[in-house]
């Protein structure tokens, strides 16, 4: 079997930190429906707004099996990518990581990944050699429509907050990294299954 080659990406940030878990750490828990909705809605807003526009961008939904895998990995506090067998549900999943010494909201974490768009040109890929674009391309990979995320507190690490999102099916295939979606009129590939510019099925 030939396995596709994929990019995996991580981001690290070091703001000021007391080193103690804040009282509201539980507010970031993805066991909470409000956090699940925030993560899904933030992704869908960003996916809906890609430039150039996408004709085949699937609408994201929360996926509990991926969230379980993400939590299991986050709890390891390795601050590195999980092995492929820990990113599998019914399909192989992709993964974005974010590490910081203080807490960040999920919307800020996801936005930090998307901001790599500044270094990306549709049809070309990275604008400059060595530019990191893989977080962005995974966020907007057209058929990565299931997402599960988790965060862990790692008190013995410099980066005490370890955020993990897994995307199913995985994106970032090297062969098409320059075109993470199909350019065209929003919902052009799904005229009968469109929800505000995103496809509910293809």
Predicted feature locations:
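Mature extracellular or exoplasmic CAP/SCP-family domains and secreted bioactive peptides
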Residues: 2-202
């Amino acid at each position: 079997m030939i396995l596709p080659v994929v990019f995996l990406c991580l981001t690290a940030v070091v703001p000021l930190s007391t080193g103690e878990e804040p009282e509201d750490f539980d507010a970031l828990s993805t066991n909470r429906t409000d956090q699940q909705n925030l993560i899904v809605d933030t992704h869908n807003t960003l996916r809906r707004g890609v430039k150039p526009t996408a004709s085949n961008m699937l609408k994201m939904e929360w996926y509990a099996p991926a969230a379980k895998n993400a939590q299991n990995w986050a709890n390891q506090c390795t601050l590195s990518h999980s092995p492929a067998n820990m990113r599998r549900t019914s399909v192989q999943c992709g993964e974005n990581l974010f590490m910081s010494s203080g807490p960040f909201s999920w919307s800020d974490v996801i936005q930090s990944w998307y901001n790599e768009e500044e270094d990306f040109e549709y049809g070309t890929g990275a604008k400059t050699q060595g530019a990191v674009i893989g977080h962005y391309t995974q966020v907007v990979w057209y058929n990565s429509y299931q997402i599960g995320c988790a965060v862990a507190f790692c008190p013995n690490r410099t980066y005490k907050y370890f955020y993990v999102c897994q995307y199913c099916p995985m994106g970032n295939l090297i062969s098409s990294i320059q075109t993470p979606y199909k350019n065209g009129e929003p919902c052009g590939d799904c005229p009968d299954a469109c929800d505000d510019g995103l496809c509910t099925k293809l």
